[in-house]
A protein has these predicted regions:
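Patatin-like phospholipase
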Residues: 1-179
Length: 179
């Protein structure tokens, strides 16, 4: 049988208050569903149906494209990779989103789709702080902004996810023989 393992700190067991046990039961329920393959994600219970899974794959592709573009221009931002590795999220497609959702305090006792988890992150993140990294995404940042991203890898990881979730999609370029 699968091993059920929790991702979250469960708190003290001796002082009794009704909320921590309720939270622990909810987290345990999702950990059990995860162990039996009924939900995906590591820290969050995320729907594993076809729509949510397609959204997760699309999110990861956008995240990777944003990260690659920034890293090519500003190699010092590689520290965001370290922040992602240290988060130890096992679902590769959702790992960046789960890591930043945990950083900003998104509620782990809710059942999410990829889209609703992304929206929960956007609702909780510091938008002004995320916008401060915009010059890196536009390719117009100075060395100081790149150094800030390197010094704050978790915050920059949040900015990468924010950019992947909020940037308009670029139109697909196709070649036409008639042109």
């Amino acid at each position: 049988p699968p091993m059920v393992r929790g991702c979250w700190e469960l708190g003290d067991s001796l002082p009794f208050a009704p909320d921590p046990p309720r939270r622990n039961v909810e987290l345990g329920y999702y950990d059990t569903l995860r162990a039996f393959g009924r939900v995906r994600g590591c820290a969050y219970a995320v729907d594993n149906g076809p729509d949510s899974s397609a959204d997760a794959a699309a999110f990861r592709a956008r995240f990777d494209a944003v990260q690659k573009a920034v890293r090519e221009k500003y190699p010092v931002t590689l520290t965001a990779d370290a922040a992602l590795l240290l988060a130890r999220m096992k679902d590769a497609e959702l790992a960046p989103l789960e890591a930043v959702a945990e950083d900003v305090g998104v509620d782990p006792t809710v059942y999410y789709t990829t889209r609703t988890l992304g929206q929960a992150f956007l609702d909780k993140c510091d938008r002004a702080r995320m916008a401060g990294f915009a010059p890196l995404f536009a390719g117009s940042a100075d060395a100081g902004r790149a150094a800030l991203a390197a010094l704050l890898p978790n915050t920059f990881l949040q900015a990468l996810v924010w950019q992947a979730l909020t940037a308009p999609e670029l139109p697909e370029v196709t070649e036409h023989e008639d042109l």
